[in-house]
Protein backbone atom coordinates (compact mmCIF):
# COMPACT_ATOMS: atom_id res chain seq x y z
CA UNK A 1 0.00 0.00 0.00
CA UNK A 2 1.23 3.48 -0.85
CA UNK A 3 2.65 4.86 2.43
CA UNK A 4 0.84 8.17 1.97
CA UNK A 5 -2.46 6.35 2.42
CA UNK A 6 -1.50 5.07 5.90
CA UNK A 7 -4.54 4.86 8.15
CA UNK A 8 -5.27 4.26 11.81
CA UNK A 9 -8.17 2.13 13.04
CA UNK A 10 -10.67 4.04 15.17
CA UNK A 11 -12.47 2.54 18.17
CA UNK A 12 -15.65 2.09 16.07
CA UNK A 13 -13.88 0.06 13.36
CA UNK A 14 -13.59 2.83 10.76
CA UNK A 15 -10.19 3.95 9.45
CA UNK A 16 -8.74 7.47 9.44
CA UNK A 17 -5.78 8.53 7.24
CA UNK A 18 -2.94 9.59 9.55
CA UNK A 19 -2.18 12.75 7.55
CA UNK A 20 -4.96 15.25 6.97
CA UNK A 21 -5.37 18.48 5.03
CA UNK A 22 -6.66 21.44 7.06
CA UNK A 23 -8.88 23.83 5.10
CA UNK A 24 -9.28 26.78 7.48
CA UNK A 25 -8.35 30.17 6.05
CA UNK A 26 -8.84 33.62 7.62
CA UNK A 27 -11.94 35.57 6.48
CA UNK A 28 -9.96 37.80 4.11
CA UNK A 29 -8.93 34.82 1.93
CA UNK A 30 -11.47 34.48 -0.93
CA UNK A 31 -13.73 31.45 -0.33
CA UNK A 32 -13.15 30.04 -3.82
CA UNK A 33 -9.47 29.49 -2.95
CA UNK A 34 -10.71 26.58 -0.85
CA UNK A 35 -11.88 24.84 -4.04
CA UNK A 36 -8.46 25.13 -5.69
CA UNK A 37 -6.37 24.11 -2.69
CA UNK A 38 -8.59 21.17 -1.73
CA UNK A 39 -8.34 19.85 -5.30
CA UNK A 40 -4.55 20.34 -5.19
CA UNK A 41 -4.38 18.48 -1.88
CA UNK A 42 -6.32 15.52 -3.28
CA UNK A 43 -4.13 15.51 -6.40
CA UNK A 44 -1.02 15.55 -4.19
CA UNK A 45 -2.28 12.48 -2.31
CA UNK A 46 -4.18 13.81 0.72
CA UNK A 47 -7.23 11.64 1.47
CA UNK A 48 -8.25 13.14 4.82
CA UNK A 49 -9.86 16.59 4.53
CA UNK A 50 -10.70 18.61 7.65
CA UNK A 51 -13.25 21.42 7.71
CA UNK A 52 -16.01 22.81 9.94
CA UNK A 53 -19.17 24.90 9.93
CA UNK A 54 -17.12 27.74 11.42
CA UNK A 55 -14.69 27.81 8.47
CA UNK A 56 -17.52 28.91 6.18
CA UNK A 57 -16.05 26.95 3.26
CA UNK A 58 -17.99 23.68 3.17
CA UNK A 59 -19.66 24.49 -0.15
CA UNK A 60 -16.25 25.05 -1.72
CA UNK A 61 -14.59 22.04 -0.10
CA UNK A 62 -17.55 19.84 -1.08
CA UNK A 63 -17.31 21.08 -4.65
CA UNK A 64 -13.60 20.20 -4.76
CA UNK A 65 -14.19 16.69 -3.38
CA UNK A 66 -17.07 16.04 -5.78
CA UNK A 67 -15.09 17.27 -8.77
CA UNK A 68 -12.19 14.90 -7.94
CA UNK A 69 -14.74 12.07 -7.65
CA UNK A 70 -16.37 13.09 -10.95
CA UNK A 71 -13.05 13.12 -12.83
CA UNK A 72 -12.24 9.62 -11.57
CA UNK A 73 -9.27 10.65 -9.37
CA UNK A 74 -10.88 9.22 -6.22
CA UNK A 75 -14.01 7.44 -5.05
CA UNK A 76 -16.12 8.83 -2.20
CA UNK A 77 -14.95 6.01 0.08
CA UNK A 78 -11.30 7.02 -0.52
CA UNK A 79 -11.95 10.41 1.07
CA UNK A 80 -12.17 10.87 4.83
CA UNK A 81 -14.05 14.11 5.43
CA UNK A 82 -14.38 15.76 8.84
CA UNK A 83 -16.85 18.47 9.79
CA UNK A 84 -17.50 20.07 13.17
CA UNK A 85 -20.62 21.16 15.04
CA UNK A 86 -20.25 24.77 16.11
CA UNK A 87 -20.97 25.87 19.69
CA UNK A 88 -24.16 27.77 18.82
CA UNK A 89 -25.84 24.48 17.80
CA UNK A 90 -25.27 22.46 20.98
CA UNK A 91 -28.93 22.44 22.08
CA UNK A 92 -29.89 18.79 21.40
CA UNK A 93 -32.69 19.65 18.94
CA UNK A 94 -30.22 21.69 16.83
CA UNK A 95 -27.53 19.05 16.34
CA UNK A 96 -28.94 16.94 13.52
CA UNK A 97 -30.31 19.92 11.53
CA UNK A 98 -26.83 21.51 11.75
CA UNK A 99 -25.20 18.36 10.36
CA UNK A 100 -27.85 18.10 7.63
CA UNK A 101 -27.18 21.72 6.74
CA UNK A 102 -23.44 20.96 6.39
CA UNK A 103 -24.24 17.92 4.21
CA UNK A 104 -26.47 20.07 2.03
CA UNK A 105 -23.67 22.60 1.53
CA UNK A 106 -21.19 19.81 0.81
CA UNK A 107 -23.70 17.92 -1.36
CA UNK A 108 -22.48 14.72 0.27
CA UNK A 109 -24.61 11.96 1.83
CA UNK A 110 -22.48 11.58 4.95
CA UNK A 111 -19.40 12.91 6.70
CA UNK A 112 -16.75 10.45 7.83
CA UNK A 113 -16.30 12.25 11.12
CA UNK A 114 -18.39 14.81 12.99
CA UNK A 115 -16.86 16.60 15.98
CA UNK A 116 -18.05 18.87 18.76
CA UNK A 117 -15.81 21.83 17.82
CA UNK A 118 -15.26 23.22 21.36
CA UNK A 119 -16.76 22.13 24.68
CA UNK A 120 -18.34 25.56 25.24
CA UNK A 121 -21.99 26.16 24.34
CA UNK A 122 -22.81 29.65 23.03
CA UNK A 123 -26.14 31.44 22.50
CA UNK A 124 -28.05 29.41 19.87
CA UNK A 125 -28.30 30.65 16.29
CA UNK A 126 -26.41 31.38 13.08
CA UNK A 127 -24.10 34.05 14.56
CA UNK A 128 -20.83 32.21 15.36
CA UNK A 129 -19.84 34.57 18.20
CA UNK A 130 -23.04 36.14 19.54
CA UNK A 131 -22.22 39.24 21.61
CA UNK A 132 -24.13 41.48 24.01
CA UNK A 133 -24.20 45.30 23.81
CA UNK A 134 -20.85 45.42 25.66
CA UNK A 135 -19.21 43.17 23.07
CA UNK A 136 -19.04 40.20 25.43
CA UNK A 137 -19.70 36.75 23.96
CA UNK A 138 -23.06 35.32 25.14
CA UNK A 139 -22.76 31.84 26.64
CA UNK A 140 -25.39 29.12 26.79
CA UNK A 141 -25.85 26.35 29.35
CA UNK A 142 -26.13 22.95 27.73
CA UNK A 143 -25.45 19.51 29.15
CA UNK A 144 -22.90 18.21 26.65
CA UNK A 145 -23.94 14.64 27.51
CA UNK A 146 -27.33 15.42 25.95
CA UNK A 147 -25.61 16.93 22.89
CA UNK A 148 -23.50 13.76 22.64
CA UNK A 149 -26.60 11.55 22.65
CA UNK A 150 -27.81 13.29 19.49
CA UNK A 151 -24.33 12.89 17.95
CA UNK A 152 -24.79 9.14 18.58
CA UNK A 153 -28.16 9.29 16.80
CA UNK A 154 -26.49 11.01 13.82
CA UNK A 155 -24.06 8.08 13.64
CA UNK A 156 -26.91 5.57 13.83
CA UNK A 157 -28.74 7.45 11.06
CA UNK A 158 -25.66 7.14 8.81
CA UNK A 159 -25.17 10.92 8.56
CA UNK A 160 -21.75 10.58 10.22
CA UNK A 161 -19.68 7.39 10.09
CA UNK A 162 -17.77 8.35 13.25
CA UNK A 163 -18.20 10.94 15.99
CA UNK A 164 -15.66 12.67 18.19
CA UNK A 165 -14.68 15.83 20.00
CA UNK A 166 -12.25 18.71 19.62
CA UNK A 167 -10.49 20.96 22.14
CA UNK A 168 -11.73 18.90 25.11
CA UNK A 169 -9.56 18.53 28.19
CA UNK A 170 -9.17 15.25 30.07
CA UNK A 171 -11.96 16.03 32.56
CA UNK A 172 -14.40 16.88 29.76
CA UNK A 173 -13.52 13.68 27.90
CA UNK A 174 -14.10 11.68 31.09
CA UNK A 175 -17.51 13.29 31.46
CA UNK A 176 -18.54 11.84 28.08
CA UNK A 177 -16.82 8.49 28.71
CA UNK A 178 -18.53 8.09 32.10
CA UNK A 179 -21.94 9.14 30.81
CA UNK A 180 -24.66 6.63 31.84
CA UNK A 181 -25.91 4.77 28.76
CA UNK A 182 -22.98 5.83 26.57
CA UNK A 183 -23.43 4.14 23.19
CA UNK A 184 -20.33 5.32 21.31
CA UNK A 185 -17.08 6.68 22.71
CA UNK A 186 -15.57 9.65 20.88
CA UNK A 187 -13.18 8.21 18.28
CA UNK A 188 -10.82 11.17 18.62
CA UNK A 189 -10.01 14.42 20.35
CA UNK A 190 -8.68 17.05 17.94
CA UNK A 191 -6.52 19.55 19.83
CA UNK A 192 -3.74 22.06 19.29
CA UNK A 193 -0.55 20.01 19.31
CA UNK A 194 3.00 20.81 18.17
CA UNK A 195 6.55 20.66 19.62
CA UNK A 196 5.85 23.70 21.87
CA UNK A 197 2.63 22.08 23.20
CA UNK A 198 3.15 18.36 22.78
CA UNK A 199 0.13 17.31 24.90
CA UNK A 200 2.01 14.26 26.22
CA UNK A 201 -0.34 13.78 29.21
CA UNK A 202 -3.50 14.17 27.17
CA UNK A 203 -2.01 11.85 24.52
CA UNK A 204 -1.31 9.17 27.13
CA UNK A 205 -4.84 9.53 28.50
CA UNK A 206 -6.39 9.28 25.02
CA UNK A 207 -4.28 6.23 24.14
CA UNK A 208 -5.39 4.54 27.38
CA UNK A 209 -9.03 5.02 26.29
CA UNK A 210 -8.47 4.01 22.63
CA UNK A 211 -9.16 7.57 21.49
CA UNK A 212 -7.00 9.01 18.70
CA UNK A 213 -5.37 12.38 19.30
CA UNK A 214 -5.56 14.55 16.17
CA UNK A 215 -3.21 17.54 16.01
CA UNK A 216 -4.48 20.86 14.71
CA UNK A 217 -2.16 23.91 14.51
CA UNK A 218 0.64 21.33 14.15
CA UNK A 219 2.80 23.89 12.33
CA UNK A 220 2.24 26.60 14.92
CA UNK A 221 -0.94 28.08 13.34
CA UNK A 222 -1.26 30.68 10.58
CA UNK A 223 -0.68 33.31 13.30
CA UNK A 224 -3.83 35.18 12.35
CA UNK A 225 -4.55 38.20 14.56
CA UNK A 226 -8.09 36.93 15.15
CA UNK A 227 -6.79 34.00 17.21
CA UNK A 228 -3.07 34.36 17.89
CA UNK A 229 -0.85 36.87 19.71
CA UNK A 230 1.41 38.47 17.04
CA UNK A 231 4.31 38.37 19.54
CA UNK A 232 4.09 34.61 19.95
CA UNK A 233 7.19 32.57 19.03
CA UNK A 234 7.34 31.33 15.43
CA UNK A 235 7.45 27.55 15.70
CA UNK A 236 8.88 26.90 12.23
CA UNK A 237 11.81 29.24 12.94
CA UNK A 238 12.83 27.29 16.04
CA UNK A 239 16.61 26.64 15.81
CA UNK A 240 16.28 23.02 17.00
CA UNK A 241 13.58 22.31 14.44
CA UNK A 242 15.65 24.01 11.72
CA UNK A 243 18.78 22.03 12.67
CA UNK A 244 16.84 18.75 12.40
CA UNK A 245 15.41 19.89 9.08
CA UNK A 246 18.93 20.50 7.81
CA UNK A 247 20.12 17.12 9.13
CA UNK A 248 17.34 15.26 7.31
CA UNK A 249 17.30 17.57 4.26
CA UNK A 250 13.63 18.33 4.92
CA UNK A 251 11.64 21.46 5.78
CA UNK A 252 10.99 22.40 9.44
CA UNK A 253 7.28 21.83 8.71
CA UNK A 254 7.99 18.23 7.68
CA UNK A 255 9.96 17.63 10.87
CA UNK A 256 7.01 18.96 12.93
CA UNK A 257 4.55 16.73 11.02
CA UNK A 258 6.76 13.63 11.17
CA UNK A 259 7.20 14.12 14.92
CA UNK A 260 3.45 13.68 15.42
CA UNK A 261 3.14 10.62 13.20
CA UNK A 262 5.90 8.84 15.12
CA UNK A 263 4.11 9.57 18.43
CA UNK A 264 0.92 7.96 17.12
CA UNK A 265 -0.81 11.31 16.59
CA UNK A 266 -2.90 11.95 13.47
CA UNK A 267 -1.69 15.25 12.08
CA UNK A 268 -3.37 17.99 10.05
CA UNK A 269 -1.22 20.01 7.66
CA UNK A 270 -2.80 23.31 6.78
CA UNK A 271 -1.49 25.23 3.79
CA UNK A 272 -2.91 27.25 0.93
CA UNK A 273 0.46 27.22 -0.87
CA UNK A 274 0.72 24.73 -3.74
CA UNK A 275 4.41 23.94 -3.25
CA UNK A 276 4.00 23.36 0.49
CA UNK A 277 0.91 21.18 -0.03
CA UNK A 278 3.02 18.92 -2.27
CA UNK A 279 5.96 19.05 0.16
CA UNK A 280 3.87 18.12 3.20
CA UNK A 281 2.79 14.79 1.72
CA UNK A 282 6.49 13.79 1.69
CA UNK A 283 6.28 13.24 5.45
CA UNK A 284 6.18 9.48 4.76
CA UNK A 285 9.52 9.47 2.95
CA UNK A 286 11.86 9.77 5.94
CA UNK A 287 12.08 8.83 9.62
CA UNK A 288 13.28 10.57 12.76
CA UNK A 289 15.59 8.64 15.10
CA UNK A 290 14.63 8.04 18.73
CA UNK A 291 17.31 10.62 19.59
CA UNK A 292 15.63 13.17 17.27
CA UNK A 293 12.30 12.43 18.96
CA UNK A 294 13.83 13.05 22.41
CA UNK A 295 15.25 16.36 21.22
CA UNK A 296 11.82 17.38 19.88
CA UNK A 297 10.13 16.30 23.12
CA UNK A 298 12.53 18.71 24.83
CA UNK A 299 11.03 21.66 22.96
CA UNK A 300 7.76 21.40 24.87
CA UNK A 301 6.95 24.54 26.84
CA UNK A 302 3.17 24.05 27.14
CA UNK A 303 2.79 27.06 24.88
CA UNK A 304 -0.68 27.46 23.43
CA UNK A 305 -1.22 29.66 20.35
CA UNK A 306 -5.01 29.41 20.23
CA UNK A 307 -5.99 30.60 23.71
CA UNK A 308 -9.52 31.85 22.90
CA UNK A 309 -9.13 34.36 25.74
CA UNK A 310 -12.51 35.96 24.92
CA UNK A 311 -14.10 32.72 26.19
CA UNK A 312 -11.99 32.35 29.35
CA UNK A 313 -14.96 33.16 31.59
CA UNK A 314 -17.01 30.31 30.12
CA UNK A 315 -17.70 27.66 32.81
CA UNK A 316 -16.59 24.98 30.31
CA UNK A 317 -13.44 26.81 29.10
CA UNK A 318 -11.11 23.85 28.49
CA UNK A 319 -7.63 25.32 28.79
CA UNK A 320 -7.45 26.18 32.51
CA UNK A 321 -6.84 22.55 33.50
CA UNK A 322 -3.32 21.18 33.19
CA UNK A 323 -4.50 18.86 30.39
From Swiss-Prot:
GO cellular component assignments: cytoplasm; cytosol; extracellular exosome
Pathway the protein contributes to: Steroid metabolism
Location of the active site: 55 (proton donor)
Keyword set includes Oxidoreductase: yes
Enzyme class: oxidoreductase
PROSITE patterns in the record: ALDOKETO_REDUCTASE_1 (PS00798), ALDOKETO_REDUCTASE_2 (PS00062), ALDOKETO_REDUCTASE_3 (PS00063)
Pfam families, A to Z: Aldo_ket_red
Recorded GO MF terms: 5-alpha-androstane-3-beta,17-beta-diol dehydrogenase (NADP+) activity; aldo-keto reductase (NADPH) activity; aldose reductase (NADPH) activity; androstan-3-alpha,17-beta-diol dehydrogenase (NAD+) activity; androsterone dehydrogenase [NAD(P)+] activity; bile acid binding; bile acid transmembrane transporter activity; chlordecone reductase activity
Family annotation (Gene3D superfamilies): NADP-dependent oxidoreductase domain
Site (described: Lowers pKa of active site Tyr): 84
Main location: cytoplasm
UniProt keywords, alphabetically: Cytoplasm, Lipid metabolism, NADP, Oxidoreductase
Tissue distribution: Liver specific.
CDD domains: AKR_AKR1C1-35 (cd19108)
Subcellular location: Cytoplasm, Cytosol
Record EC number: 1.1.1.-, 1.1.1.209, 1.1.1.210, 1.1.1.51
Domain of life: Eukaryota
Gene Ontology BP annotations: androgen metabolic process; bile acid and bile salt transport; bile acid biosynthetic process; cellular response to jasmonic acid stimulus; daunorubicin metabolic process; doxorubicin metabolic process; progesterone metabolic process; prostaglandin metabolic process
Subunit field text: Monomer.
Sequence similarity: Belongs to the aldo/keto reductase family.
Known disease link: 46,XY sex reversal 8: A disorder of sex development. Affected individuals have a 46,XY karyotype but present as phenotypically normal females.
General function of this protein: Cytosolic aldo-keto reductase that catalyzes the NADH and NADPH-dependent reduction of ketosteroids to hydroxysteroids. Liver specific enzyme that acts as an NAD(P)(H)-dependent 3-, 17- and 20-ketosteroid reductase on the steroid nucleus and side chain. Displays the ability to catalyze both oxidation and reduction in vitro, but most probably acts as a reductase in vivo since the oxidase activity measured in vitro is inhibited by physiological concentration of NADPH. Acts preferentially as a 3-alpha-hydroxysteroid dehydrogenase (HSD) with a subsidiary 3-beta-HSD activity.
Name of this chain's protein: Aldo-keto reductase family 1 member C4
Species whose genome carries this gene: Homo sapiens (Human)
Lineage: Eukaryota, Metazoa, Chordata, Craniata, Vertebrata
